[in-house]
Amino acid sequence: MMHTRKLAVAGGFEFTPDIHSDHRGLFVSPLQDEAFVAAVGHRFPVAQTNHSRSARGVLRGLHFTATPPGQAKYVYCARGRALDAVVDIRVGSPTFGQWDLVQMDAESFRAVYIPDGLAHAFLALEDDTVMSYLVSSAYRAELEHAIDPLDPAIGLPWPQEVEFRLSARDTIAPRLAEAEAKGMLPQYADCLPAAAPPAHPDRPTVR
C-alpha cells in the first residue's frame, strides 16, 4: 500500500509506503510501480541509482539538470533524517517560484518524485544521513546547474538552529532571478512529458 500526496509544485508527488515490521526488523518498498503510474501517469525510467551520505548540517542543492534532456528523480532517506525541498524553476509553469518541503527519515521512508525541470535540495538533520536517488538519466557534469538554496526570494524555511555546510559550487550559485536573467532556467513546455501514442494508431480509439 502506498499513500500519495500532490506537492504544491505542479507534477511533483510525495509517496509514503506502508512498513512491515516484526521482531526481525522491517521491510519496505519505497518505490511501487503501480502506485507511481496511478499518480504520475507513466513508469519511472530508472537509468542510474545514486547514494549520498551527509553529516548534520550538510545542505545539498538547489540542483537541476538542463532541459532538454532533463533528469527526473525519485528520492528517499535510507538512514537518518533530512528536510527535502522541491522548487519550481520552470519558466512559464503555473507554479513557478513555488516550493514544497518533505520531512524524510528512515522510519517513514517517505519519498519524493521530482520531474524534469524542478530544482531539488535537502538538508541533513542528523550525522550519517543517507539519501538514495533513482534518476532517469546518467550524470553529465556539463548539464548540471545550481541555484542558491538560501535565496530570500525563494524563501525556503530551513531550520536556523542548524549550521549549514555547503559545497563550493552551491555557495556561489546564482539566485533564482539571476539564473533566469542569464537564461539558465528550463522552459515549462520543454519539461512536459510527450503524449503517449494510441495503442493502435491505424484505427480510432474506442472509449
Stretches found by the model and what they are:
Residues 109, 116-135:
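Ligand-binding loop in jelly-roll beta-barrel domains
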Residues 1-107, 126-128, 138-207:
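Non-catalytic, conserved peripheral segments adjacent to functional cores
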